[in-house]
Amino acid sequence: LAQLSKLIKRNNPTGLDDDFIIIGENLPNTELFKYPCRVDALVAVICLEGELICNINLKEYRITTNMMIINTPENIIQVKDIGNRKFYGIAVSSAFFEQSFLDARDMIPLYMQIQKEPCFHLSNEDTDIFCQFISLMQLICHTQDTPKKTATLLRLGSALMYKIHDTI
């Protein structure tokens, strides 16, 4: 996650070190993912424009507009870049995710579904909701540090995961 953080933080600092990263509209140089690798983070991104081909656990996926991809730390991912594209999303460390207020009984079916099928289409409405969540989290990240800033982001992250659960 630290290498990904270095690529992304230049444009989207969160102030939360390597635990929470916002992936802005333009994906970073995908050179880091040119070869199969693991990302020690939960990464959820949605394609706003363009397309990208990636392999997750040796299975190829074509990501196009209004598609979400969720990568878990156990996965082996490889990205093949195709033309212009815009993505928006987050990368969350395992430590940050473990601190969230998610009920494991609710998340196990979601986790199993993501492992089975990490890419899925979203409606325009769900795409907008996801982007609004990320925008709000980004706004909070750019505010001055407060005693409850991390707790606020944890709860928004939890709410986002529940929304993803309802969506898929």
PLM region descriptions:
Residues L1-R62:
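Generic protein-terminus/edge-of-domain signal
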Residues L7-P13, K80-T143:
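A hydrophobic/aromatic-rich effector-binding and dimerization subdomain
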Residues L32-Y35, C119, P147:
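Jelly-roll (double-stranded beta-helix
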Residues I53-N55, N71, I76-I82:
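Short beta-strand His + acidic residue motifs that chelate non-heme Fe in jelly-roll/DSBH
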Residues E60-R62, I69, K86, F96:
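Short, surface-exposed beta-strand-loop junctions and turns on beta-sheet-rich folds
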Residues I63-I76, A91:
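Conserved metal-binding segment of the jelly-roll/cupin
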Residues E125-I168:
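An amphipathic alpha-helical interaction segment
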